């Protein structure tokens, strides 16, 4: 395992601990967080949730974009490695530059699409204001 993988894993562990702290805060503040009044403290918690709890889902979606594109174009031994706050896809195959471009771009394309869906959801879904802020914040991060 390379040094960069170890440092990425260490950061994921640290972020995971902050994520656990965020869950603890959310449980403690659930009644005020989910009421109809959005405070500055609620917004701080929204950003913590968006980054430390939802970002791993965005990373997974990003890597899945690479994975499915590689599978679609006939790569062999395609493997998705999700490490929480980072990940990578490995595969074997020889591709022309345009196919490689598509496989490489599939991850960011999925992330962008997910972000736009979150923004749209924040606008059109009939949900509480705090959940609108959460969707919009995650969409911004994507």
Question: Model regions: which residues?
Answer:
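Hydrophobic transmembrane alpha-helices and their immediate loop junctions
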Residues: 1-142
């Amino acid at each position: 395992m390379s040094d960069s993988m170890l440092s990425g894993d260490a950061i994921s562990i640290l972020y995971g601990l902050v994520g656990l702290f965020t869950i603890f805060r959310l449980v403690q503040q659930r009644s005020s967080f989910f009421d109809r009044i959005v405070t500055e403290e609620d917004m701080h918690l929204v950003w913590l949730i968006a980054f430390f709890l939802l970002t791993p889902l965005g990373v997974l979606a990003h890597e899945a974009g690479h994975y499915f594109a590689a599978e679609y174009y006939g790569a062999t031994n395609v493997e998705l490695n999700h490490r929480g706050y980072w990940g990578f896809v490995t595969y074997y195959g020889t591709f022309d530059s345009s196919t490689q471009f598509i496989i490489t771009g599939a991850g960011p394309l999925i992330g962008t699409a997910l972000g736009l869906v979150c923004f749209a959801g924040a606008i059109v879904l009939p949900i509480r204001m705090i959940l609108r802020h959460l969707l919009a914040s995650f969409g911004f991060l994507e």
